């Protein structure tokens, strides 16, 4: 198993999940042109795959801090990103629902609302929802 695959396995473990119980996860180096450059992962519906961006700060931080499968804030954020993208695959394009699933996952993993990781996801949600009101996107991405 590659180091990148081990990071995904660790994030899934935090969720109490395995590769068998999640939509397929594909690692990509960079987001496509139609996705946000700040995205950690994305889906392109109706394709049922979660694409995790290995050049994202969240993934790079998880790789750098990995001595063993940890419950670091970065790993919890990555796990919540997977929950966000899975929500899209199961429920569709609604960003509000996906972000609420992500925030709920962070809470379940022990990340409190006053934590920087939780707040950064809230800020991303607000920015994405504001942008969507102005112009709908075709690609869904979690940060």
Label the model's feature ranges.
Residues 93-134:
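Post-HExxH zinc-binding segment in Zn-dependent metallohydrolases
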Residues 1-48, 67-68:
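A metal-dependent hydrolase signature that marks the N-terminal structural subdomain at the beginning
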Residues 35-79, 89:
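Active-site scaffold of zinc-dependent metalloenzymes
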């Amino acid at each position: 198993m590659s180091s990148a695959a081990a990071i995904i396995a660790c994030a899934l473990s935090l969720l109490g999940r395995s590769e068998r119980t999640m939509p397929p996860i594909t690692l990509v180096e960079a987001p496509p042109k139609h996705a946000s450059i700040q995205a950690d992962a994305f889906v392109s519906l109706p394709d049922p795959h979660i694409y995790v961006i290995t050049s994202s700060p969240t993934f790079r931080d998880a790789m750098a801090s990995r001595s063993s499968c940890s419950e670091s804030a970065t790993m919890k954020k990555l796990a919540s990103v997977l929950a966000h993208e899975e929500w899209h695959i199961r429920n569709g394009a609604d960003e509000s629902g996906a972000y609420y699933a992500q925030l709920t996952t962070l809470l379940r993993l022990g990340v409190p609302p006053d934590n920087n990781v939780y707040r950064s996801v809230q800020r991303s949600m607000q920015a994405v929802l504001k942008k969507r009101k102005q112009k709908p996107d075709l690609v869904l991405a979690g940060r």
